[in-house]
Amino acid sequence: MLEEVKGAQERANVPENSIETKAGDDRSMYVYVPASGCPDAKQTQVVMFLRDGADEASAQAAMKEYGLDALAEKEHFVLAFPNPRQSGWSERDAEDMDYLSRCFMALPQGKGKVGGFIGMIFYIGGSPSAGALLLAMSARRPLNVAGVLLSELPADYSIPQDGVNAPQVAYLCGGAARAADYFGKVNGVTGADARPLEHAVLYTSPVNPNVRHIVSELPFSAQEAVRAWDMLFCKARRWSNDTYGTYQKRTDFTARGFVAHVNDPGLGVNEGFAHTWYEYVPPRLRGSKEKAPLVFYFHGIGCVPLYGAEQSGWHDIADRENFIVVYPKPARNKAWNIWDEPGMPSDQAFVLALLEHMKRTYAIDESRVYISGFSMGGMMTNALACAYPELFAAAAPCNGFNSGYLVPASEMWTMLRKMPTGRGLPDGPSEPVTRTRVRADAKKAAFAYRMPLIQNSGLLDGTWPAAQDDPFKRLASFDYWKTYNNIPLTPYEPAAACESGLTADETFYDCADGRFLHHRWFSRDEGKPALFEVVLAKRMPHALDLRQLELAWQFMKRFSRGKDGSLHIDP
């Protein structure tokens, strides 16, 4: 189908899937949406094939010659054919690069009504000029290029010297093999990192095994397209969590043994609402009666559970550390009911019912149930931590703060209704004081609970140092958990040398590359345990770094919850 690509659109403001470009000319593209269907947009890959023609016949011919329609039907990706201008593709024309980004933005608004994930856009250069453009784009704008397949390069082409030298997944067919030295350089590989294949060599980065490129002796063909997909494209995802992103491996959920509950009314909660969640049990625990910890992970607004699984990698940590993971989906509109607003299904009741289901189904150590989440899922984590401290031993919210307690629903309602996920919301909240706050205050008044909490975020997510009037209440959230855990409040110093403006009992940089600014506060309780920590990633916007979850697990696993609500700490 022919789709318009408006030149005026410069930004797609979608949570965790935004892309920025520059305005340009109104152009068009042809799009093939597989009849077999696509997953949620944030789990959908997009393959863009650049050809020299600009008509439907040339798109159809390329699709059939290289078997791309059959591959799209099998693998459920969106196939796009951007149309070149009359002068053809030019690696010297920034408008062509901007236009390719606008093609991605145009997909959800088009006739196909299907989107993809910015970190899973793969490009195929079907001609020398297209290959030159894509090599220039991967060199200069790598964040928007998850992978490239180059079939040919112009005879007089010179590798860009003004690139940023970022790692890049790539497949080089015979006519583009002379770019091998460039990809070897940016991916940091040597001959020791090479593995011979039939008529090709696979190179794997010694720093990140998810960064790979293949140099093939063969010309581009349908068979080469399949090999590029099977060995590279289906395994690659570039998350926008650093200056030029980070490649992480994809998860084969079926092969890993995820247990899916899709639209399952069996929990008997929310008047029989059909809830969705996914369970993961490490192989060593399957069929075992040995009690194991349980981790809940709540994805961000506008996302889905399997996206959250790949984003967080909790199941990979579970394999090593022997715990069970559950990835729930909110009842409505991919947004968590963090306030427990009665005009909507109760996601908190859902989590409680799901916890009981997990205890009936598996051998769960009830004293070691932990919660974590990202963005609005981080808000959900905060809300559950204060509303149900008797059930959870520790919490690790990421990029979402205690808005469910600190921010009246009325303050966020207008914003939520404007978002794509806000369709069908009531006109406004039905109660002035949220049930989350009422429940949390009552629990704390009845017992001196402590809630160990490690808050993750990025130093490019919002403005740091944070303002006191921050609408998401970052500083107020920090002070809430300090007070909750009997930690003295410390002054906030926005002019301090520390990037965050936070003053803590301990401040240090984590990991060999100094990526994480780590703050730690100690309770005045006996033994002075560290019950509150904040970890901020340098160069990171609204995203996650897998190493933050590793730090979160090292923090949380030390804590367990007694039946009387008391907190126990391993030495």
Outline where the language-model segments fall.
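A domain-start/cap signature at the N-terminus of enzymes
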Residues: 1-46, 63-66, 74-78, 83, ...
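Active-site glycine-rich loops that stabilize anionic/oxyanionic intermediates
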Residues: 44, 51-56, 292, 299-304, ...
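Structural cue for short, hydrophobic secondary-structure segments
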Residues: 47-52, 81, 297-300, 327, ...
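Short amphipathic alpha-helix adjacent to the substrate-entry channel of hydrolases
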Residues: 60-79, 308-326
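Cap/lid segment of the alpha/beta-hydrolase catalytic domain
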Residues: 80-98, 311, 319, 323-348
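Alpha/beta-hydrolase active-site loop
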Residues: 88-115, 123, 135, 340-363, ...
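Short beta-strand/loop motif that positions the catalytic acidic residue
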Residues: 171-173, 454-457
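Acidic catalytic loop of the alpha/beta-hydrolase fold
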Residues: 176-177, 460-465, 541-543
